[in-house]
Amino acid sequence: MDIGNPVIQLCLEGTRAEFEHKKEEARAFYQQAWEIHIDDYEACIAAHYLARLQKTAEDTLQWNLTALEHAFAVNDESVESFLPSLYLNLGHSYETLGNNAEAKKYYQLAAALGVIHQATNIPQSNFENQKS
């Protein structure tokens, strides 16, 4: 990740603001990152961070889907290490919205890349026994 990239710098500033409990300031940094993105890599990063501070679960899901869409449009390995996080966020979005089948799908995609997550609202027996 190129920390000299303006989109990444804005996302780092947004993260700093988040840790300082300044959510509106953080959201503004992430929104600015989205507005200045020039390629799919930058769009993926900005959308991922924008998803974190949405006011509704539906909006969070949409931004997470946008991030994944742009990740898939990147034609190199630059987002590969980022995919587990995108999958986990999508899993959590679907779980929050009560769509356990979709949640399980994305949690399993993350697990296939080495990141295991325990779903909070999906009974473990259902999670293990459902087929992909």
Which residues does each PLM region occupy?
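Flexible helix-coil transition and linker loops at the boundaries of alpha-helical arrays
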Residues: 1, 33-40, 71-80, 116-120
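Alpha-helical segment of the N-proximal tetratricopeptide repeat
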Residues: 8-25
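Residues in the short coil linking paired helices within alpha-helical repeat scaffolds
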Residues: 22, 56-59, 99
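Alpha-helical adaptor scaffolds
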Residues: 40-80
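Conserved small-residue packing positions in alpha-helical repeats and bundles
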Residues: 14, 48-51, 84, 91
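TPR repeat positional signature
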Residues: 10, 44-47, 87
